[in-house]
Design a protein with these regions (language model features):
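Transmembrane alpha-helices and adjacent helix-loop boundaries
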Residues: 15-242
Length: 242
């Protein structure tokens, strides 16, 4: 092909853009996107609650290891908490989803995300629970032992209920943070709220209103959880004397 033909053809290819769909009005875009965003929000809540449940179980184990009279258990709990709190959650997600297959352990995106979030939030909740347990006056342990209660019975019937009142605000904050942290699992193709918004953006080429809409949904979810937190704190609060 002659050079005088190649040159304008190259310029045409260089500066041409792929056709884009016509922009919708923002109200129409948000109305059309609402069902998809709502579905993503539901999946986000389910994802966060599931991670919170598994994380709470692990946090209880870590907290008990942290207060046990065993240096090995104490050291294991401290090292775990240090690693989880001292490394970015995004890196932990990558290690579990992209790193474990090199060891022969392959996980689907959803289980990998739940494991990563559960393992991460457990470290923070375990410290909250451990601090709440240690915040109870030591004389209550001695009084319980004098009544014939075992260590487990004392923890369950005497120390645990009081420690729960202390730990509720911190545990609730962990759940609120977990709602926002679920957005990170979108990098491993888990279709939660942020991923749902990104999929709509890919077809509409209107990122700003959709990202703002996703942020608004996250904010609403967190506000609802804050309301539940305050209600729970009032229910667990000790009666005041007048």
């Amino acid at each position: 092909m002659p050079p005088f033909v190649l040159f304008p053809l190259g310029l045409l290819l260089r500066f041409s853009r792929p056709p884009q769909p016509p922009h919708m009005s923002i109200p129409s875009l948000l109305v059309d996107s609402l069902p998809v965003l709502a579905q993503g929000a539901v999946l986000t809540v389910k994802f966060a609650v599931l991670s919170m449940v598994f994380g709470l179980v692990l946090a209880v184990v870590l907290a008990l290891m942290g207060i046990a009279r065993n240096r090995v258990l104490n050291a294991i709990a401290r090292i775990y908490v240090s690693l989880m709190r001292g490394t970015p959650l995004l890196v932990q997600i990558f290690v579990i989803y992209y790193g474990l297959p090199s060891l022969g352990i392959s996980l689907d995106p959803t289980p990998a995300g739940v494991i990563a979030l559960s393992a991460n939030v457990a470290a923070y909740m375990s410290e909250s629970m451990r601090g709440a347990i240690l915040g109870i006056e030591s004389g209550q342990w001695l009084a319980s032992y004098s009544l014939g209660l075992s260590w487990g019975q004392t923890l369950r019937y005497v120390i645990g209920p009081q420690a729960l009142r202390i730990a509720v605000p911190s545990l609730s904050n962990s759940l609120i943070s977990l709602i926002k942290d679920t957005s990170l699992v979108s990098v491993i193709t888990v279709t939660e709220l942020l991923r749902s918004a990104q999929e709509i953006i890919a077809s509409t080429y209107q990122p700003l209103p959709l990202y703002l809409a996703a942020a608004a949904v996250y904010w609403v979810l967190c506000q609802v959880l804050e309301w539940v937190q305050r209600w729970w704190e009032r229910r667990l609060a000790l009666p005041t004397r007048h």
